[in-house]
């Protein structure tokens, strides 16, 4: 395993571990998701450069566009939750309590 692969895998695993263990605030969960998506974007971009495939060159940009959509939807949810409930705790997002 090359150092580049190791660092990208470690970044993804740290984001996943942060998402599973530190799920108290919505903002921290969104930051962990963004870290995971960024490591996936970099690994896909490096993979398309390594294989020199023109048919796969749009996949990293598509992933980045979906990541931006996910971030904007997450921030909108964060603002709506903070306005209605007064905090960004993940326990407020339980729909069974409504």
Swiss-Prot record:
The chain crosses the membrane at residues 1-21, 26-46, 59-79. GO terms for cellular component: mitochondrial inner membrane; respiratory chain complex I. Signal peptide: none annotated. Its main location: mitochondrion. Gene3D superfamilies: 1.10.287.3510. Its EC number is 7.1.1.2. The keyword Mitochondrion applies. It is a multi-pass membrane protein. It catalyses: a ubiquinone + NADH + 5 H(+)(in) = a ubiquinol + NAD(+) + 4 H(+)(out). InterPro entries: NADH_UbQ_OxRdtase_chain4L/K, NUOK/Mnh_C1-like. Keywords: Electron transport, Membrane, Mitochondrion, Mitochondrion inner membrane, NAD, Respiratory chain, Translocase, Transmembrane, Transmembrane helix, Transport, Ubiquinone. GO terms for biological process: ATP synthesis coupled electron transport. Pfam families: Oxidored_q2 (PF00420). It is found in: Mitochondrion inner membrane. One of its GO terms (molecular function) is NADH dehydrogenase (ubiquinone) activity. It is an enzyme of class 7 (translocase). Belongs to the complex I subunit 4L family. Core subunit of the mitochondrial membrane respiratory chain NADH dehydrogenase (Complex I) which catalyzes electron transfer from NADH through the respiratory chain, using ubiquinone as an electron acceptor. Part of the enzyme membrane arm which is embedded in the lipid bilayer and involved in proton translocation. Core subunit of respiratory chain NADH dehydrogenase (Complex I) which is composed of 45 different subunits. This is NADH-ubiquinone oxidoreductase chain 4L.
